[in-house]
Amino acid sequence: MRMRKKPWARPELEGCDFFVINPKEYKGKWKEFFGNDKPIYLELGCGKGTFMAVHASENPDINYIAIDIKDEVLGLAKRNIEKAYEEKNRKTDNVKLMAQEIGLISEILSEEDVVSRIYINFCNPWPKEKHKKRRLTHMRQLEQYKTFLKSEGEIYFKTDDDELFEESLEYFNEAGFRIKYITYDLHNSDVEGNVQTEHEKMFSEQGIKIKFLIAMKDN
């Protein structure tokens, strides 16, 4: 379903102190931009920001980068993140929000940026064969992530889609990642501290089991 236009979104984003208008300027300089050496966690496709809002507001010792492409969802993410920080009486000093085509993620991140963890939550499964290269877990994407993901850095991947999950396992293996953890039923697993996204809640209410894995970049 296409999201309705939100004329307020772009002006709000441009006036937001944690929205990065031109992220390409900071390629190789994200630690300098944050102003500290805290580890960097990256969410690819942050949607309405409910996942990022919880993680970033509860973990001040980690720097977070949240990426999506459309102003409409980024505007909602901005509001949700602000609300979470306000509830904890915290400044939004460890989170950056930006618009970027994820297929071109190397435009804004390089090996100097040293990302410790990547979150990929309920990305588009692109089921047609001719579209599979667009998947955020496809080999082509994983090779990009490897350039800025640190040695033994991790990718946390959640999906409702069985085919995407199984084929992603193959992608991770082919790209030289090691599967550190895997479950085909996240909500009945031993995983602690899971933060649900809006899609995750919706699929769970429909009785769909959530698949989850942690893939680690080997040395």
From Swiss-Prot:
Pathway: tRNA modification; N(7)-methylguanine-tRNA biosynthesis. It comes from the Bacteria. Keywords: Methyltransferase, S-adenosyl-L-methionine, Transferase, tRNA processing. One of its GO terms (molecular function) is tRNA (guanine(46)-N7)-methyltransferase activity. The keyword Signal does not apply. The lineage of its organism: Bacteria, Bacillati, Bacillota, Clostridia, Eubacteriales. It catalyses: guanosine(46) in tRNA + S-adenosyl-L-methionine = N(7)-methylguanosine(46) in tRNA + S-adenosyl-L-homocysteine. Belongs to the class I-like SAM-binding methyltransferase superfamily. TrmB family. Substrate binds at residues 128, 160. This is tRNA (guanine-N(7)-)-methyltransferase. Its EC number is 2.1.1.33.
